[in-house]
Each structure stands twice: as structure tokens, then as C-alpha cells.
Amino acid sequence: MPFVDTSTLPVIERPPGWHRRYFHSTHVTFAHYDFKRGSSIHEHFHSQEEVYEVIEGELEVIIDGVAQIARAGLVAIVPGNVRHSVKALSDGRAIIVDHPLRPDFG
């Protein structure tokens, strides 16, 4: 799988306001999201390290109780097993990468 055309991947809305297309490589899960202002991802944690790369718009990312605004040029890195949540402050797009891959994604 050296190339993936993400435009051909099915779109899944989960949670409401977050539309994702995702795929796995051997060791990593990649998720391309379109998000709507006001939508959120509840506080949670998982064993994977997670990286949020905002392409357009702004997200409030809370990592272990500390809030920061993620926007183009500012990447949020969530260590594994650390509680985090996300709120969309605007409409936008982001790429979220998990390592190792998330077999539960789907």
C-alpha cells in the first residue's frame, strides 16, 4: 500500500460533527477529519500516542487538563494513556495520526 487516495475512502461521522476518512499502515492509523464548529470529542484516553495536525480552522485541545488552541502551524501531541478532549472552535479540517495503529477504529 505505497499510495492511498483518501478521496475514495468511506466517510464516517463519529462523533456528530466530525466526518472522517481513515486508513491504517503497518504501524500507524491516519484519520482525515472535517469538523463543524461547536462539535467535540469527549474526554478519553487510549494507549496510542496521537498527533493532531490542523489544516484549516481551530481546535481547543485539552491534554491532561491543560487547554491549548491548535491551528495551522501548531501541532498537538497527546502521549499515550493521557486524558484528552477536543472542541471545534470553527469549521475546519485536521489530520490525526495514532501510533501504534488503532485496531478499534472503525
Language-model-detected regions and their locations in the chain:
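Short, conserved beta-strand element in jelly-roll/cupin
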Residues: 34-36, 46-61
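Conserved short histidine dyad/triad with adjacent acidic residue
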Residues: 15-16, 29-46
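Structural motif
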Residues: 29, 51, 58-60, 67, ...
